[in-house]
Amino acid sequence: MSENHETVVSELNEESGGGCPVAHERAPHPTQGGGNRGWWPNRLNLKILAKNPAVANPLGEEFDYAAAFRTLDLPAVKRDIAQVLTTSQDWWPADYGHYGPFMIRMAWHSAGTYRISDGRGGGGAGQQRFAPLNSWPDNGNLDKARRLLWPVKKKYGQALSWADLMILAGNVALESMGFTTFGFAGGREDVWEPDEDVYWGPETTWLGDERYTGDRELENPLGAVQMGLIYVNPEGPNGTPDPLAAARDIRETFRRMAMDDEETVALIAGGHTFGKTHGAGDPDNVGPEPEGAPLETQGLGWKNAFGTGKGADAITSGLEGAWTPTPVSWDNSFFETLFGYEWALTKSPAGAYQWKPKGGAGAGTVPDAHDAAKSHAPTMLTTDLALRFDPVYEPISRRFLEHPDELADAFARAWFKLTHRDMGPVARYLGPEVPAETLLWQDPVPAVDHELVDAADVAALKVRVLASGLSVSELVATAWASASTFRGGDKRGGANGARIRLEPQRGWEVNEPDRLAAVLGTLTGIQEEFHAARTDGRRVSLADLIVLAGGAAVEQAAREAGFDVEVPFTPGRTDASQELTDVESFAALEPAADGFRNYLGKGQRLPAEYLLLDRANLLTLSAPELTVLVGGLRVLGANFRQSSLGVLTATPGVLTNDFFANLLDLGTTWRPSGEDDNVFEGRDAATGELTWTGSRVDLVFGSNSELRAFAEVYASDDAREKFVRDFVAAWAKVMNLDRYDLA
């Protein structure tokens, strides 16, 4: 077979004789990404519910990364990384003889894709190795940083994931240049395929910015200003060198990564204390990114034809220069430089806007990165000047200038938050450098400090719950509302902590605050009665009781359908306090839509069925789990405001497969209601009599060919028991998504 990739692809795309005379292009071969989406690009992409299948993991299902990581001698690993940092390689020479700044950028850009709005992105799975992130313009030449670390990865093998290694290398880089970090936690397990479930923006060209509307309003859930950037354009908005306009972009993008103004200033200043930018020549000299590079480059991209193509001739961002006189040492020189000069606009050799001291000041104060006989003036970026001229950032920056110890502490904490924000609860942290301090952004829950309920207690509590007057609908809806806040990306949310009783969750529209308060009041009464009757110190948290009550309701509904099942329940959840709940941070978890409850908030860009798929993805559900849960929740009456939409049963509150049987009934015809594009009417095909109403979410299980295949399984006469047992299994999975103590 030919070794020339381009020739092979060209031949594949050439029209063969006898083809359609108007077919100017061939559809891609399946190996090139062809398939159904080429014909129907708007069809539901259920593949996002089959992420990282076990068959794609070369380590096998039995591999335990946490156990493997615990075998590491972490100080020895860090020494090996430190050795890499100060051993310059001819194929990619280190600036100033130290790869530390390079590794900080790599770690930052690994973690910096995180956005709080949907919990996706971040460094938790090592996605920087894969497209599109490995080829983003903002990640230029970071392929070399990972190659430099390959000897360390090779030595420690599967005990050290790429995801952990990239973040750890950033920490070691900081420490090797004199900075004291806040800590490090391992536990990021590698995946083996790119994330196909992250919406990075609508643009189809690098650095496009179609994501804005109105007065520079950035589309949710995006966290960067242009396609292929981590945060902001360092030259200013769309390359306009306006520090105040840049400050607005900085504030918005960092806020979307859960950083406040002080953390933002500390991160930018701390990161730009080290290293330099690279723009030695015309960027047209730079070749394609890794994903577009020829086969023989072996995954390395951005080949540079300017001069030697490396070292002093490197081209990455197009900006050129260092911020401080001490680019590989931790000190306060960033702010000393920022406030020590007046700045004039200039351009780099690559033509990018940047700033230099006015009147030739600062000349000779900055060492050259590769030639000790040369020196330069410092350089600042438009985004750096924002820290001096923005009225909010400026006093923070001056305080850090005058109090370097405060900068060091703020940067250490912000760096730890940046690199650990998507790891979820502290229970997932591994290693000897995990900080002892509890941090609000970690969504802390108390440790269990009491005896847990046993099987007899659980049985007695179920009896009390079912005799309380609360309906199956109320109990199921409350448990679902508590647990379904979980997000698989950043591992936030879930039932542990019972934060559904706290602000902001108790006030969310989707949770029906008045109804929720009544249910929680009754459950709290049951909890208090249980505690009052105990003399052995045994307790049940409200978090546990909410889940237990929902399970009891499911069991009751199954019994009424003729099936005796037990919903798995393991106590051990605790109740968080309002003081340890960041209201603003938790507000990001509020569902804009929840198809499982047939809830659709106002102003949604996507139709309801796409939003259902997105929520199922956040809940780490498979397509069959999604299907059985919707069908079960409909007949259990868990809809928002007890709506009849999709309640395709004559016996609400009974766990039957009626939703599927009636949806697929050939005697029913469906048509839009005419009043609401999310509502459809199901009428008797013979009489025209209105029989049911349903939403887009409901009808998609009959319309989409893949979902219909699952629906047909559960609608079958022999699937009644299977439906119940599959629903119980999927329900239990959702209730336990945040129970890392059970792993």
Swiss-Prot record:
There is a cross-link at residues 108-231 (Tryptophyl-tyrosyl-methioninium (Trp-Tyr) (with M-257)). The record marks 105 as: Transition state stabilizer. Heme b binds at residue 272. Its cofactor is heme b. Formation of the three residue Trp-Tyr-Met cross-link is important for the catalase, but not the peroxidase activity of the enzyme. Bifunctional enzyme with both catalase and broad-spectrum peroxidase activity. This is Catalase-peroxidase. One of its GO terms (molecular function) is catalase activity. It is an enzyme of class 1 (oxidoreductase). It catalyses: H2O2 + AH2 = A + 2 H2O; 2 H2O2 = O2 + 2 H2O.
